[in-house]
A protein has these predicted regions:
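Short alpha-helical elements
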Residues: 1-243
């Protein structure tokens, strides 16, 4: 595994203890700055399942007390964590954090916004607050949440109302437009989970999970940086990973 000398390769294959999560998260933050993604016009915000164990298995897993059971539209019930990421319009992951799978999107987002507004050296993975709004789905709905996030953290969240909401309904055209904007974060998750194999990880320690996650995010942003150097579309990863 150590025969690859290219930094993208070595980043992906080094064991977590050789690259502590703090260093990897710092590298992610550095790449965001290098890619000039700190002040995007908007960021797409979304959560996704991060399973670590088959929830139907008996007994307690390695991360009992940290991970728990949650629901995913794509996976159904799963055991693990909920991952939240913010992505700029070109695909750069500008920040991320995770919590137990049962954590509500609104609760996870509040921690994310609060940490961006009042940075904590132990949680640098969330990145820096941007100047534009966050584009989210209806899972982040809530008038009280909206006002609190805006007033307390300066986070302006735009999301479609639920279809049975008493608020003014959005047109299908507007919903499709918001969905098209948010597609970029789905593309980023596809890279993390499938291209880079995050869904196949079965960590035994929380620190190991943080390192594995940070390594995938760093590799994702590094591939974007490399494509910039080569004059290629930012999200064209397939042949890069075929070296």
């Amino acid at each position: 595994m150590q025969r690859f000398s290219h930094p993208a390769r070595s980043l992906a294959v080094q064991p977590p203890r050789a690259l502590p999560h703090a260093a990897l998260e710092a590298f992610v933050v550095h790449l965001v700055a290098v890619l000039d993604a700190q002040r995007p016009p908007y960021e797409a915000l979304d959560s996704s399942a991060m399973p670590i164990r088959d929830c139907k298995r008996r007994g307690h897993g390695w991360l009992a007390g940290r991970a728990d059971i949650g629901w995913s539209n794509s996976l159904g019930w799963y055991e693990g964590f909920s991952l939240l990421t913010a992505t700029d319009p070109t695909g750069v992951i500008t920040g991320f954090c995770f919590a137990a799978a049962s954590t509500a999107d609104q609760q996870l987002a509040e921690t994310f916004f609060a940490t961006r507004a009042r940075p904590n050296r132990r949680l640098i993975s969330v990145g820096s607050a941007g100047a534009g709004p966050y584009i989210a789905d209806k899972g982040f709905e809530g008038a009280e949440n909206y006002l609190r996030w805006l007033e307390s953290f300066g986070a302006h969240v735009i999301h479609p109302p639920k279809r049975n909401s008493r608020k003014k309904r959005w047109s299908k055209r507007l919903r499709r437009w918001i969905a098209s904007i948010r597609q970029i974060v789905e593309n980023a998750y596809e890279k993390l989970f499938n291209t880079f194999g995050l869904w196949r990880e079965r960590p035994h320690e929380l620190e190991g999970l943080r390192a594995r996650l940070a390594a995938r995010v760093a590799l994702h942003n590094f591939c974007i940086w490399l494509n910039d150097q080569l004059g290629r579309p930012r999200l064209t990863f397939a042949d890069l990973l075929g070296w």
